[in-house]
A protein has these predicted regions:
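Fungal transcription factor middle regulatory core
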Residues: 23, 29-141
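Intrinsically disordered or highly flexible coil/loop and linker segments, enriched in small
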Residues: 44-47, 51, 105-119, 145-156, ...
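Juxtamembrane/interfacial segments around transmembrane helices
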Residues: 26-30, 86-88, 214-221, 279-284
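Long, amphipathic alpha-helical regulatory blocks in the mid-to-C-terminal portion
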Residues: 1-20, 37, 68-72, 105, ...
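Intrinsically disordered, low-complexity transcriptional activation domains
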Residues: 220, 306-395
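Short amphipathic alpha-helical segments embedded in low-complexity Lys/Glu-rich regions
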Residues: 21-27, 220, 268-276
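Eukaryote-biased recognition of C-terminal alpha-helical segments
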Residues: 173, 235, 242, 258-326
Length: 395
């Protein structure tokens, strides 16, 4: 149905400014809003379906929606309303669209979605020939100056806009970092690995803020659609390789905080493919830290964080239940966890029209993790295994 809607929209010309110029200001603005909502939703669905080509591309010229209130628009108007210099009803839509408009022209995004389209991006895009890392810094400053500085953090819509922006930019930086370093012929330095962990931690911190605040309660249906699993893989694989790195202590703390707000589905379905995959990666990483602790004599390193204690407890519960039921579904030892079918990794992320974050695109992140160990094809990634019908209607 979404594909049909996209094709109808293109036939109507709502992706083209030349076609939109033939309509009244109100009609043109409504069409822009519709096009961008379709594009962002289609991009996320493409990620979840492991489909490489997304509608978010530099092949059309529809402008982002105007930063105006709905009351500023009327059928009688002959000219578009003046753009507001403060927060408006359309704030969240406008900011999301401006971020995505940047990304669809970015080389780090097109490298993963459709490299052939890089040739049609203007050479002067994104502040000239500066690095894309610097361009992302400039984008964040622009968004802050144009929109976020007018926001009230206690307002629900404004809070969502602020932290969605932070989360989106963190994911963009994470992808840009891997674009620069994944295929290098020389091994990554500790500084580069620390930078990757710091970016992954920032993704989880933003995600935790969004999921844990009462101000975002009515947006949970949307937040749960964007789970930052690549950040977990980045962190856990690095912690397995470098259990005593300078970012390790902070990483375990940040993962514990995010786990408390994110993994609500584990108590309902501990036999899910996701639980098995995540549990194995987590406990392997912690085992490496325990080995490093015993070898180095630092007992503080072996104090299990809340996330490890919780997962171990849940594994023990599942093992006990399995024994009681006289089944072989899930053994006590983590090495007994059955994981043996192909894994569509593109569905794991992240990030609202944020580009393709499929883990097959991150061979260096995966390291020694065998991507064929997992079978997540049956997982409802929209709600991480939580039945949408169980949500509070008040959300």
């Amino acid at each position: 149905m979404l594909g049909i809607a996209i094709r109808i929209a293109q036939r109507m010309g709502i992706h083209s400014e030349s076609a939109l110029s033939k309509h009244s200001p109100l009609e043109a603005e409504l069409r822009r809003r519709l096009w961008w909502s379709l594009v962002l939703f289609d991009t996320r669905m493409s990620e979840m379906a492991d489909h490489k080509t997304a509608t978010l591309a530099p092949t059309w010229d529809c402008k982002i929606p105007l930063n105006v209130n709905d009351s500023d628009l009327s059928p009688e108007m002959k000219e578009p309303p003046a753009v507001q210099g403060n927060s408006t009803d359309a704030l969240f839509v406008v900011v999301r669209s401006e971020l995505a408009d940047f990304v669809r022209h970015a080389a780090f995004y097109l490298d993963f979605t459709n490299p052939a389209l890089k040739s049609i991006v203007k050479p002067g895009q994104h502040e000239g020939l500066v690095s894309e890392a610097a361009a992302l810094e400039n984008l964040e400053k622009t968004i802050d100056d144009k929109y976020l500085k007018f926001c009230d953090p206690e307002n629900q819509l404004h809070f969502m806009t602020i932290w969605w922006t932070r989360s989106y930019l963190a994911k963009c930086r994470f992808l840009e970092h891997h674009t620069r370093h994944t295929n290098l012929s020389v091994p990554l330095t500790d500084a580069q690995r620390d930078a990757a962990i710091a970016l992954a931690c920032r993704m989880l911190e933003c995600d935790t803020r969004l999921r844990s605040s009462s101000l975002s309660k009515r947006f949970q249906w949307m937040i749960y659609l964007y789970f930052p699993f690549p950040a977990y893989i980045q962190i856990l694989q690095d912690l397995r390789r470098r259990p005593g790195s300078k970012e390790a202590e902070r990483a375990w703390e940040i993962m514990s905080d995010n786990y408390d707000t994110t993994f609500v589905f584990i108590n309902k379905d501990s036999d899910s493919p996701f639980f098995k995959a995540f549990t194995r990666m987590l406990l392997d990483a912690w085992e490496a830290r325990e080995v490093a602790s015993s070898q180095g004599g630092d007992l503080k390193l072996s104090i299990a964080p809340p996330i490890v204690l919780s997962v171990r407890h849940r594994v023990a519960q599942v093992a006990q239940n399995a024994q009681t039921a006289d089944t072989q579904q899930f053994g006590m030892g983590i090495n007994d966890v059955p994981m043996s079918m192909p894994m569509p990794m593109g569905s794991m992320h992240n990030m609202s029209g944020q580009g393709r974050y499929g883990m097959e695109l991150y061979p260096d992140v995966l390291g020694q993790i065998d991507v064929n160990l997992f079978d997540l094809s049956a997982m409802d990634w929209g709600f991480q295994g939580v039945d949408p019908g169980s949500w509070d209607p008040g959300l």
